[in-house]
Amino acid sequence: MTFDDLKIQTVKDQPDEKSNGKKAKGLQFLYSPWWCLAAATLGVLCLGLVVTIMVLGMQLSQVSDLLTQEQANLTHQKKKLEGQISARQQAEEASQESENELKEMIETLARKLNEKSKEQMELHHQNLNLQETLKRVANCSAPCPQDWIWHGENCYLFSSGSFNWEKSQEKCLSLDAKLLKINSTADLDFIQQAISYSSFPFWMGLSRRNPSYPWLWEDGSPLMPHLFRVRGAVSQTYPSGTCAYIQRGAVYAENCILAAFSICQKKANLRAQ
């Protein structure tokens, strides 16, 4: 082994001072204040980033909930709107049906009105014809005046008010008539039937001054005994005289001053027949 070989080996065995110097400088850099500050800043930034991500996640969750709620509200509003639209459609359909029914009703009423108008026109024509007939009939005289009852040769009027015998006589005279006079059994039967509906007394044209005098009619003719018998106070004497009235088919005598209904009688106008 030569000297040069030992030198070379010695050189190889010596440590690399430059490399060790670099390592020492690197460790010294790691423990420098600037590196610690940078690491702390980076940690704070990472922590802030994590917090930001968490906050954003929470906000995203809230936004998602709001979107879900809003979607639910929109769905509810949609259903509500659909229900309103459906109700409106049903209302329109019902309105259309009502309108159709109303049209049919109007058409029916119009048809009935037309029919009624035709009937009214026919009735109007019939009324005109009836008026013409009444005019022709009016030119002919009736046997008895209005409200009088015709029987045989006479007309009879039954009064609606009660008066004494003398006042009743005046009433009949004002009507160009006299109080009732019965000339036959047929007349008696007719009067009895005519007043059978009533229980009131009716004055007749039969009277006498006192019991010693005969019963006389207004025209002075005497009562025929076979027609009827006068009942009641036939033997009584009254200052105003005794008069006869008919009630329930029988004839009675009474004070002429008392009030009763009356029956007027006059001749019928048979020339119109």
UniProtKB/Swiss-Prot annotation:
GO terms for biological process: blood circulation; immune system process; inflammatory response; leukocyte cell-cell adhesion; lipoprotein metabolic process; proteolysis. Keywords: Cell adhesion, Cell membrane, Coiled coil, Disulfide bond, Glycoprotein, Immunity, Inflammatory response, Lectin, Lipoprotein, Membrane, Palmitate, Receptor, Secreted, Signal-anchor, Transmembrane, Transmembrane helix. The chain crosses the membrane at residues 37-57. It holds the Pfam family Lectin_C. A lipid is attached at C36, C46 (S-palmitoyl cysteine). Residues 151-265 form the C-type lectin domain. Residues 58-150 are annotated as: Neck. Gene3D superfamilies: Mannose-Binding Protein A, subunit A (3.10.100.10). PROSITE patterns: C_TYPE_LECTIN_2. The record marks N183 as: Not glycosylated. SMART domains: CLECT (SM00034). Residues 1-22 are annotated as: Disordered. Glycans are attached at N73, N139. Induction: By inflammatory cytokines such as TNF, IFNG/IFN-gamma, IL6/interleukin-6 and by pathological conditions such as hyperlipidemia, hypertension and diabetes mellitus. Up-regulated in atherosclerotic lesions, by oxLDL, reactive oxygen species and fluid shear stress, suggesting that it may participate in amplification of oxLDL-induced vascular dysfunction. It is found in: Cell membrane; Membrane raft; Secreted. Changing C144S: Abolishes sorting into the cell surface and binding to acetylated LDL (AcLDL) while increasing N-glycosylation. Expressed at high level in endothelial cells and vascular-rich organs such as placenta, lung, liver and brain, aortic intima, bone marrow, spinal cord and substantia nigra. Also expressed at the surface of dendritic cells. Widely expressed at intermediate and low level. Changing R229N: Does not affect subcellular location but displays a reduced affinity for acetylated LDL (AcLDL). Abolishes binding to acetylated LDL (AcLDL). Changing N183Q: Does not affect glycosylation state. Changing C264S: Abolishes sorting into the cell surface and binding to acetylated LDL (AcLDL) while increasing N-glycosylation. Receptor that mediates the recognition, internalization and degradation of oxidatively modified low density lipoprotein (oxLDL) by vascular endothelial cells. OxLDL is a marker of atherosclerosis that induces vascular endothelial cell activation and dysfunction, resulting in pro-inflammatory responses, pro-oxidative conditions and apoptosis. (Microbial infection) May serve as a receptor for adhesin A variant 3 (nadA) of N.meningitidis. The cytoplasmic region is required for subcellular sorting on the cell surface. It is linked to Independent association genetic studies have implicated OLR1 gene variants in myocardial infarction susceptibility. Homodimer; disulfide-linked. May form a hexamer composed of 3 homodimers. Interacts with HSP70. This is Oxidized low-density lipoprotein receptor 1. It comes from Homo sapiens (Human).
